[in-house]
A protein has these predicted regions:
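Conserved GNAT acetyl-CoA-binding A-motif
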Residues: 113-125
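Alpha-helical elements of Rossmann-like donor-binding domains used by nucleotide-donor carbohydrate transfer enzymes
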Residues: 16-20, 37, 104, 108, ...
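Acetyl-CoA-dependent GNAT
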Residues: 24-82
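Conserved acetyl-CoA-binding loop-helix of GNAT-fold acetyltransferases
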Residues: 92, 98-111, 134, 138
Length: 158
């Protein structure tokens, strides 16, 4: 597991926000199942025990006063010509929202991506998740495509 501090700056209240990059190496894995577990595992130093979709997961997280208050967990698809970073999970602690923390977190996330050769960021977002859509748009992401669904009723099969 690679863990590296990547910067710090004040949020809108003046609190110092520290950003850290984490990368799974070899058999290590990253992806929290629950947000509180994610925070506890980092704080307890057990990042190597996380589970994930693949062994290429990475994370950028932010802390205030040594408390994790936000994160982005992401990976890259191996068949992607455009070196897209896919956001798997993102979160800011509800007690720290409305302070510009997601923008700070995303800024350091983009810094890491540029340094590692990524050229694009993508995220699946439900059309019903207005807060997530707004946070994506606040950092310059745009709606790109539509997912089509049809829910099948049991009698549709007969």
């Amino acid at each position: 597991m690679v863990v590296k501090k990547i910067g710090s700056e004040p949020d809108s209240t003046g609190a110092i926000v520290t950003a850290t990059y984490m990368e799974a190496i070899g058999g290590s894995r990253i992806v929290p199942v629950l947000m509180k577990n994610f925070v506890k595992l980092i704080e307890d130093g057990h990042a190597g025990k996380w589970v994930t979709f693949n062994n290429k997961s990475k994370a950028v997280y932010i802390e205030i006063d040594n408390k994790i208050v936000g994160h982005i967990v992401y990976d890259h698809r191996s068949d992607d010509l455009f070196k897209t970073a896919w956001i798997i999970l993102s979160w800011v602690d509800e007690n720290y929202r409305r302070r510009g923390l997601y923008k700070i977190l995303h800024k350091y996330f983009e810094k890491v991506l540029k340094e590692t050769g990524s050229t694009k960021i993508a995220s699946y977002v439900s059309v019903n998740n207005a807060a997530r859509l707004a946070s994506c748009e606040s950092v310059g992401m745009i709606k790109h495509c539509y997912r089509m669904e049809k829910h099948l009723e049991q009698n549709d099969w007969q």
